[in-house]
Design a protein with these regions (language model features):
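A residue-level marker of the well-folded mature domains of exported/periplasmic proteins
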Residues: 3-7, 21, 26-352
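Bacterial N-terminal signal peptides
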Residues: 11-21
Length: 352
């Protein structure tokens, strides 16, 4: 079964049934005691959780020969707590957690610890949590790539106004990405080469929240925004929809996650770039960490630490790649996306 159809199956499992998917390695029975509990956050902040993370975790954990469950909380923090409770009742010893909010996530991690289990922060750091390791992409590099992409596209323009739409304020990742944005943009704002435009966090990373925020930004500036740092493709899509609704032209615009729609917008000239994070590597790294914790071994791949309250959290930080019109085909070569997902309908003419 190819990657596209595996993702479609994941959508049915995670969104249609909204139950834990308990699976096992090739030699284990499905009734075996649960070992690893993967807790994903939602289906709206990004398509990645359903289309990429869920099937990639299933593949990695099955290959590791451990029993596992994969659930999606659909943006409901209490649902995620209930899913974690069910995992514990089924014997799970390791939680791979993508946080919805810090309070509920800390509660989940404490419950696992009380039961003799361990936790992994996956993609989002739980500030104040007690995870043994944080598996993520290099957040500062993500933000720097976004800002650099927009700045490059603004070359030749005098003191362009750059607006920023950061991610959800309850997600520590949003602050990592912002720090990368700041590292590139702040010196240019200070020197007067760029003009600082409106800046806002987008609650829950939702396009439905980003659209009215960006609409207000345009009203505030009389439509004089020359470029936008959008934290991910979802938010970038809201910017594009707003520009189109106001009959405004495309402007330099960043994204993240290399979603099919994000790549389509890049090909059509509406989005400048997206940050490509090869999710199979992240899922594989988290699966390897989970297996190591199950066996009481050292977590492989730790290459640094991230401050978490008063402590330094061991971190597996993975590299990222900027995707533009010039190199989008890499996504097909890597089998991250298929041509049939991107080069279809009105966008087929842009693919060569």
């Amino acid at each position: 079964m190819n990657r596209f159809f595996r993702r479609s199956a994941a959508i049915v499992i995670l969104v249609g049934a909204v139950v834990a998917v308990v699976a096992s390695g090739a030699t284990a029975r499905s009734s075996a005691k649960l070992q690893v509990c993967v807790l994903l956050p939602d289906t709206k902040s990004s398509v990645r959780w359903v289309q990429f993370d869920a099937p990639d975790f299933a593949k990695a954990l099955k290959a590791a020969g451990v029993t596992y469950s994969i659930t999606n909380a659909l943006g409901d923090a209490q649902k995620q707590v209930s899913q974690a409770d069910q995992c514990l009742a089924n014997g799970a010893k390791v939680a791979v957690l993508t946080s919805i909010d810090a309070g509920s996530s800390i509660a989940i991690q404490k419950k696992f610890a009380a039961a003799g289990g361990k936790s992994i922060d996956y993609d989002r750091q739980v500030v104040g949590g007690i995870a043994k390791v944080y598996v993520t992409f290099d957040g500062k590099a993500v933000g720097a790539a976004q800002a650099s992409g927009v700045v490059s596209a603004l070359k030749g323009k005098s003191k362009p106004v750059v607006a920023e739409l950061w991610g959800g304020p309850t997600d520590q990742n949003a602050f990592w990405f912002k720090s990368g944005n700041d590292a590139v943009l702040n010196p240019l704002f200070s020197s007067g080469k760029l003009t600082k435009g409106p800046q806002k966090f987008v609650p829950d990373w939702l396009a439905t929240n980003a659209a009215p925020i960006f609409t207000q930004m345009l009203l505030k500036t009389n439509n004089k925004i020359d470029g936008v740092i959008a934290a991910n493709d979802n938010i970038a899509g809201a910017v594009i929809a707003t520009l189109k609704a106001k009959h405004l032209k495309p402007i330099p615009l960043s994204g993240q996650d290399a979603t099919p729609q994000g790549v389509q917008y890049i090909l059509a000239g509406w989005q400048t770039m997206t940050v490509y994070k090869y999710v199979p590597d992240e899922a594989k790294a988290a699966a390897a960490a989970a297996v190591a914790l199950l066996k009481g071994k050292k977590v492989p791949g730790v290459n640094g630490f991230r401050k978490n309250g008063s402590k330094q959290e061991p971190t597996v930080a993975l590299p990222v790649v900027s995707i533009t019109k010039a190199n989008y085909k890499r996504l097909f070569t890597d089998k991250f996306l298929t041509k049939s997902q991107v080069c279809v309908g009105a966008y087929a003419k842009y693919c060569k």
